[in-house]
Design a protein with these regions (language model features):
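Hydrophobic, aromatic-enriched alpha-helical segments typical of multi-pass transmembrane helices
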Residues: 1-224
Length: 224
């Protein structure tokens, strides 16, 4: 496969993966939401997952597939840009992003585990494991995304201002993840929904920047 066709395929993967991921995110927001006051966080999310039934399996399959497409697109982008100009931070950002995506996919797959184990296990424990993976890999993925976005800004690969703003948003989300991670480590906060609001609000806002970023970068790759 030529570099041109590889870049085009990578761009298509970014566009398609970005759109699917964003649609799944919007659906999850519409049918879900933060826990009500005094509700045990892990039990709430586990029960919400069970309540969605087999739809959870569909959402998880689609979201996982979308993230695989996005990861491939970023990998192709890195290869293409490295051929033009070597950059260690771009390579590091790509690696961190892909590792973070793998973590996200593992965490999301635990939704299916909750469905499968609903009649034989403490599903709240599975939800707590899911959230721990999500919180630990989240900063890795967003740091990687920030490094890649800053590199694109320096190359003016896409609109430099938008790329820098997106990178700043990603860095703020990292702080929100870390803040929520330490708060939820205290069992006394497990019945306080506001404990996880910073992380979930951050990633929700970031999703709107991400889908536009994926479309901009993907379409640029398809033109190369």
């Amino acid at each position: 496969m030529s570099n041109s066709s590889s870049s085009k395929l990578g761009g298509q993967c970014l566009v398609v993966g970005g759109i699917i991921s964003f649609i799944i995110f919007i659906i999850q927001i519409l049918i879900g939401g933060p826990p009500p006051g005094n509700e045990h966080i892990f039990s709430y999310f586990a029960n919400e997952t069970v309540g969605r039934g087999s739809a959870t399996v569909i959402y998880t399959l689609l979201w996982t597939f979308a993230n695989v497409l996005i990861a491939y697109g970023i990998l192709v982008l890195n290869g293409s840009l490295q051929e033009q100009q070597k950059d260690g931070l771009l390579g590091l950002g790509t690696f961190l992003f892909i590792v973070g995506q793998i973590g996200f996919m593992i965490a999301t797959s635990m939704d299916v585990a909750i469905i499968y184990a609903q009649d034989s296990a403490n599903i709240a424990n599975i939800a707590s494991g899911q959230m721990s993976v999500f919180f630990m890999f989240g900063p890795v993925a967003f740091l990687g995304g920030a490094l890649v976005s800053l590199n694109l800004a320096s190359r003016e690969y896409i609109n430099a201002l938008y790329a820098r703003i997106t990178a700043v948003v990603f860095l703020i989300v990292i702080v929100a993840f870390i803040y929520s991670s330490f708060n939820i480590a205290d069992p006394g906060n497990h019945n306080i929904p506001s404990t996880i609001i910073p992380a979930f609000a951050g990633i929700s806002i970031a999703q709107f920047f991400i889908v536009i970023w994926n479309l901009m970068v993907g379409m640029k790759m398809m033109k190369n």
